[in-house]
Amino acid sequence: MQFDNIDSALMALKNGETIIVVDDENRENEGDLVAVTEWMNDNTINFMAKEARGLICAPVSKDIAQRLDLVQMVDDNSDIFGTQFTVSIDHVDTTTGISAYERTLTAKKLIDPSSEAKDFNRPGHLFPLVAQDKGVLARNGHTEAAVDLAKLTGAKPAGVICEIMNDDGTMAKGQDLQNFKEKHQLKMITIDDLIEYRKKLEPEIEFKAKVKMPTDFGTFDMYGFKATYTDEEIVVLTKGAIRQHENVRLHSACLTGDIFHSQRCDCGAQLESSMKYINEHGGMIIYLPQEGRGIGLLNKLRAYELIEQGYDTVTANLALGFDEDLRDYHIAAQILKYFNIEHINLLSNNPSKFEGLKQYGIDIAERIEVIVPETVHNHDYMVTKKIKMGHLI
């Protein structure tokens, strides 16, 4: 498929056009027509109903939903993607509410600041969806994409979306979407590209605190940051004056290894080795909340159960439905840029960290090997990291 850039899509939306938004291939892997409510024209919903044929919904911000008392359709949402459907509505000035004109009127009234809850009949023929406050950075769905796109065009936070179906009633994917794009001369973007666009446009970290932190390995400055859109907390240890070319360790949090000194892995030993090195040579340790290579603590324990049954650290993650490594280093790159660090000597044995930082514009001048002893308990783990994950150990 041939995708357009986000800026061109925003321009099209602001001109009242409809675009195609495609989600992740591991999610629905489908394309929705998306329009911004404030900019859409009288033909938008008719075009969606005639050409796309899916369910026409109206994503809105939480503020709009709360102001108009748009309560959830069900108390117990069992949708596999957690889509926040509210009760369906028609504006009181409609008749049956189903015509394209009347659904357009209902959608437009959703963003009218003079509208009140009593102005909408329930149930109706338009289906509002409530977007997460942090948009696609919190949930990579079409609901959040529509509201984010509306905001990025300077419009009120609401849109209209409709799944694209083929003539035979199946969902349009891949080449079907490309053909639809070409037939109707529409812009087409991905939610992944929208996520990256927002990451580049908006600050993702917020400085919260700085303290002196005496440790068994020396006294460090400890900085606390908060990830703006995920609310994750990130700790940074530094030693000495921060330089533009700095020694840096990215360390993924490992409760079992770092705190309980588990010998299943080498994480705790790597952290101690890195703290000793940074204390002696100066530099920085960025402590990232990426437990279990991004799958979380409880899922890591589930992976350990599988390892006890004969799986290795890679196949266990795959068996649980995860990639072998879910980590992303964009937040780490943001922190480095916060400190004006342009070049780093990276303390790591993991090549994916090099590539992960390079894609966000961080220059890695040198790799510093982190040497830790192997134990009888982590031998198989170390072998798997070397053979299957390419670690330089």
From Swiss-Prot:
Q: Which residues bind Zn(2+)?
A: 254, 265, 267
Where does the record place the region GTP cyclohydrolase II?
201-393
Reaction equation(s) it catalyzes: D-ribulose 5-phosphate = (2S)-2-hydroxy-3-oxobutyl phosphate + formate + H(+); GTP + 4 H2O = 2,5-diamino-6-hydroxy-4-(5-phosphoribosylamino)-pyrimidine + formate + 2 phosphate + 3 H(+)
Where, by residue number, does D-ribulose 5-phosphate bind?
27-28, 32, 139-143, 163
Q: Where is this site: Essential for DHBP synthase activity?
A: 125, 163
Return the cofactor note field.
Binds 2 divalent metal cations per subunit. Magnesium or manganese.
Q: What EC number(s) does its UniProt record assign? A: 4.1.99.12, 3.5.4.25
Q: Per its UniProt record, what InterPro entries does this chain match?
A: DHBP_synth_RibB-like_a/b_dom, DHBP_synthase_RibB, GTP_cyclohydro_II, RibA, RibA-like_sf, Riboflavin_synth_RibBA
Positions with a binding annotation for Mg(2+) 1: 28
Residues that bind GTP: 249-253, 270, 291-293, 313, 348, 353
Q: Which family does it belong to?
A: In the N-terminal section; belongs to the DHBP synthase family.
PANTHER family cross-referenced by the UniProt entry:
3,4-DIHYDROXY-2-BUTANONE 4-PHOSPHATE SYNTHASE (PTHR21327:SF18), GTP CYCLOHYDROLASE II-RELATED (PTHR21327)
- What name does UniProt use for this protein? Riboflavin biosynthesis protein RibBA
